[in-house]
Amino acid sequence: MAIYHLEAKMVSRGAGRSAVAAAAYLSCSRMLNEYDGVQHDYTRKQGLGWRQVFLPATAPAEWQDRETLWNAVEETETAKDSRLAREFVAALPIELSREKQIQLLQDFIKEQFVADGMCADAAIHDPYPPGHNPHAHILLTVRPLDEKGKWQYKTEKEYLCVKDGEERGFTAAEFKQAQADGWEKQYQYKVGKKKVYMSPSAAQAQGYERVSKYPKSTKFGRQNPITERWNSDEQLVLW
């Protein structure tokens, strides 16, 4: 019977880790981290079954070389405590052949990560005895690439606005046009004993006092309606 195991970790310079070292371990290879001059050698590690670099169409072709890719990431992140990459470790069904395991991983990575502009580096490790514990390592860039092949921000604020009773979210870049189209930012106002988000025009008409000067925003980009639903009080009660 197939088992389920998925572990997600952050590769952070603040924790003493590097993306180059993680990629060298994943690929069982020797790589030089140009950021600190440290060479990481995992060529003696056994059990490598497959490895591949996945790039969006806008990525530089030379990033197919994983050492070049992850050194580019290290160069971009200059802070001493930078988050460099996301790392996933997932168990693979032993019932599947190696070819099907690879196909499963390729489809998953392309659909879930590369389609959103992320670069990914993946490998299958199958330690001795073979077939006993096959698992996948996936190393993912924290920043996506834009249509010009440039790194985007790790996080992006989204302003939630209202117009004619409809609520929508806009990034900072989109808000100027949204404002011209009549959309209003929402702020917190005191309504009785509660704090309620609404537009300034609606609050002024009802005489409510604003309690926050900051507009409503989602800290980490566009809201995921599925996640929001399953984290709602209603769903928690049902659970």
Question: What are these language model-derived features?
Answer:
Residues 1-239:
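N-terminal nicking endonuclease/strand-transfer module with a His-rich metal-binding environment
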